[in-house]
Amino acid sequence: MIVLGIDPALGSLGWAVVAKESAKLKYLASGVIKTSSKDEIHHRLSYINSILEKVILEYKPNMATIEETFVNTNSVTSLKLGYARGAIMSLIGRYDLDMREFKPNTIKKTVTGYGHAEKDQILHMIKLLLPGTAAITNSDEADAVAIAYTCLVTKNY
């Protein structure tokens, strides 16, 4: 089972690929897709999808999992995040991948044991749980690893 974890965002999206072979988890790759707020939104969404498409074609995941969205007090921010999520879900559908969503607190609790963990705690635990992740310093990237990890350890596939 190969899972693509995505921490959805328009400005700085984290992605990670984690595999489960027998009972062992294996970190394969991760990264961050950054877009500029100066660019038009349709160009930003297209760029995000073009990078994620390359990841899908290279690693051939069986499933994609994304963090559920909470409603932000700023409706414009929520709407833009909704655009990003919709574009990502469309890409996932185009490649006929199964998809799961997890609440942020579920991800935090699975990775750290505490549902209200801070970003640095998630980053620290990911490095302990998955060999190969020591070089990760970006919290969006770490969140994406945590999302994929949550899917695999909760056997939600």
UniProtKB/Swiss-Prot annotation:
Localisation: Cytoplasm
Residues reported to bind Mg(2+) 2: 67
Top-level EC class as recorded in UniProt: hydrolase
Named cofactor requirement(s): Mg(2+)
Any one annotated GO CC term: cytoplasm
One GO-annotated biological process of the protein: DNA recombination
Catalytic reaction annotation: Endonucleolytic cleavage at a junction such as a reciprocal single-stranded crossover between two homologous DNA duplexes (Holliday junction)
Function, in words: The RuvA-RuvB-RuvC complex processes Holliday junction (HJ) DNA during genetic recombination and DNA repair. Endonuclease that resolves HJ intermediates. Cleaves cruciform DNA by making single-stranded nicks across the HJ at symmetrical positions within the homologous arms, yielding a 5'-phosphate and a 3'-hydroxyl group; requires a central core of homology in the junction. The consensus cleavage sequence is 5'-(A/T)TT(C/G)-3'. Cleavage occurs on the 3'-side of the TT dinucleotide at the point of strand exchange.
The protein, known as: Crossover junction endodeoxyribonuclease RuvC
Species the sequence originates in: Rickettsia bellii (strain OSU 85-389)
